[in-house]
A protein has these predicted regions:
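Residues forming the flavin
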Residues: 1-594
Length: 594
């Protein structure tokens, strides 16, 4: 602590509280009369400053607080704004820059707890009472120092796809020991099932092989495939994971035997050389990992259409885009017509948004009642690239694209759309309320399927397209990591992807310090975005652990046994496994759990 800070804190006076109330751009002020709250709070004894600001978290808002602290007007502050999970660190930093102890600041959530759930006078009244309570607490605040604990110079990456590999490499480059845990037998994740990557048609094999090679050759990276995390405890800098590695199954062995390195034939698991980490144990092994930080790179799974959705599982001629991509990769020769399973394909219908941008009442729910209302972001580019490949390699095969919107964002992506138009791909646009309908063609000598659609581009005219093959551009879904979510108490969004603290200010951090996100476990994204997120997470880990110690908040929770009713709600809500436990005690001649 600096001398200036010591001098300020040894002369702390009571009743010099500054209160700062945020409009939050209308998020708060649309329902809370912020000026009324300010006027009422200003009348509380001890409040010497009461100000409002459109965005307290902005640089100008923080400077306002720092200026009041520096000129001695106040010695404690109360900020009434959005959730402290978003901006508590922001305001602690502002207080520290004014050479004041950051724990002389109290935060009030009047957005999520007030304006988003109350309206009118009720909202204003509740906000006033919450801020008044915070003022009373602020008067009792004392300067505190964070707890310093040793941080292990080790990181664990869970997930061996593109994001996990990138994170492991970046961590190793920064001098950390890394453990990479992957549940499948091989590295590479979903990208290992691709052939060419949009928009520049790089080979997926080249990308995965280069990343895998760096990981496999790095002695500071320990790889465990067929492994899952089964136990978790600890805190930032000192986590402990229980990991179990499963033996190679007979089914896996059969899939391995179908992979011939000499002629590079594709197997079900290994689409190319360079993603197998080496010999696997034939026994189940359990071990413990002590690690300083964890990066979650658990990836995504491709959407599986519901039976009957666009004719899927009803007509054998209806396949998914990943399935077609594998067929195209395995076709060794070009020709006038594309061939699939020995059949000549004269006409292909590509249907966008299968499993994405779903609408309640229109699209079918899964067995858990879920809908994917989000855009998967990569499907349009992948579909357009596939259309271009077909038109170039098989000029006799006609390609029709059925879409709601074409979303080719990012560098080079729009060129795919322009190229498809030049390649004479036919585009038919439908509305969500009128999805394309797939029917069997009655004539055995004609095309097997017909796709019927009301085309927006021709003012709703009903058009029928004959098709030998219908391809569904399936989107992304979060992998099933419910056990990890429950074990680590990870926050999950409405879309079932893991939820970051703040999409702009803390985009790769979770509410539990020391656990970070990388790649598509967080949201649909392309390979470049996944690698960027992985590198960001690696840099954040390096920043947290580089000094060899981490700072913990100097707050110690105590259980008031006289008030405890033994419900266990606190144990369930606590983010830190093992920090709280119900124990049997004697009370009034009986044994109770508290």
């Amino acid at each position: 602590m600096t001398d200036d800070k010591n001098n300020k804190e040894t002369t702390l006076e009571k009743e010099k509280v500054g209160v700062y109330i945020c409009y939050c751009g209308g998020n708060i002020s649309d329902h809370v009369d912020v000026e009324t709250v300010r006027k009422k709070i200003k009348r509380i004894p001890g409040v010497v400053v009461a100000r409002t600001n459109m965005f307290i978290c902005s640089d100008s808002g923080q400077e306002m607080i720092i200026e009041d602290l520096n000129n001695g007007s106040i010695d404690r502050i109360v900020v009434a704004s959005c959730s402290p999970s978003l901006h508590e660190m922001t305001f602690r930093g502002a207080v520290s820059r004014a050479n004041m102890n950051p724990y002389l600041y109290e935060h009030v959530n009047i957005r999520e707890q007030v304006s988003w759930v109350h309206h009118g006078e009720a909202a204003t009244d509740k906000a006033t009472r919450l801020v008044a309570a915070a003022v009373a607490k602020a008067k009792l605040l004392k300067p505190l120092e964070p707890i310093q604990v040793k941080a292990l110079q080790h990181a664990t990456v869970i997930g061996g796809g593109v994001a996990g590999l990138r994170a492991a490499i970046d961590l190793s480059d920064r001098g950390f020991e890394v453990m990479l845990i992957e549940k499948s037998p091989f590295l590479g994740g979903q990208v290992a099932h691709l052939d060419q990557i949009a928009p520049f048609s790089e080979k997926a094999a080249d990308l995965i092989s280069s990343l895998s090679r760096l990981v496999l050759q790095d002695t500071s990276i320990k790889i465990h495939t067929r492994s899952v995390v089964e136990k978790f405890e600890g805190y930032i800098g000192n986590f402990k994971l229980g990991v179990k590695t499963y033996p190679q199954s007979v089914e896996d062995q059969e899939k391995l035997e179908r992979f011939d390195v000499s002629d590079n034939k594709r197997g079900e698991f290994i689409p190319f050389v360079g993603v197998c980490p080496g010999p696997e144990s034939s026994d189940t092994e359990a071990f413990t990992v002590e690690t300083g930080a964890i990066i979650l790179a658990t990836g995504f799974k491709s959407y599986t259409p519901r039976p009957g959705e666009y004719g899927y599982a009803e007509f054998e001629e209806v396949v998914t885009l990943p399935e077609l991509i594998r067929v195209l990769a395995e076709n060794e020769t070009n020709g006038n017509l594309l061939k699939v399973n020995g059949r000549e394909i004269r006409s292909v219908a590509l249907i966008h948004c299968a499993g994405s941008r779903q609408i309640p009442g229109i699209h079918p729910e899964d067995e858990s009642g879920n809908l994917n209302e989000y855009c998967s972001r990569t499907c349009c580019s992948a579909t357009l690239q596939t259309a271009n490949i077909i038109r170039k390699a098989y000029p006799g095969t006609r390609v029709f694209e059925f879409y709601r919107d074409i979303r080719t964002y990012g560098r080079g992506q729009e060129a795919l759309y322009e190229q498809a138009s030049r390649n004479k791909v036919v585009f038919l646009r439908f509305e969500a309320e009128n999805l394309p309908k797939i029917t069997r063609n009655g004539s055995s000598n004609d095309f097997p399927l017909r796709v019927k659609v009301r085309d927006v581009l021709t003012f709703g005219e009903e058009i029928e397209v004959p098709a030998d093959l219908v391809v569904l551009a399936t989107g992304m879904e979060p992998n099933n990591i419910s056990e990890l979510v429950e074990m680590m108490k990870l926050p999950v969004g409405a879309d079932r992807f893991l939820l970051e603290v703040h999409p702009k200010l803390r985009p790769v951090e979770l509410s539990l310090a020391g656990i970070l996100l990388a790649g598509t476990c967080q949201a649909p994204m392309d390979i470049g975005e996944a690698c960027n997120a992985a590198s960001s997470a690696a840099v954040k880990v390096a920043t947290l652990l580089a000094r060899g110690q981490v700072e913990l908040d100097p707050f110690i929770a105590e259980v008031d046994l006289d008030k405890c009713t033994g419900t266990g709600a606190c144990v369930e809500a606590c983010l830190y496994e093992g920090a709280l436990n119900l124990v049997a005690i004697g009370a009034d001649g009986q044994t109770v759990h508290r």
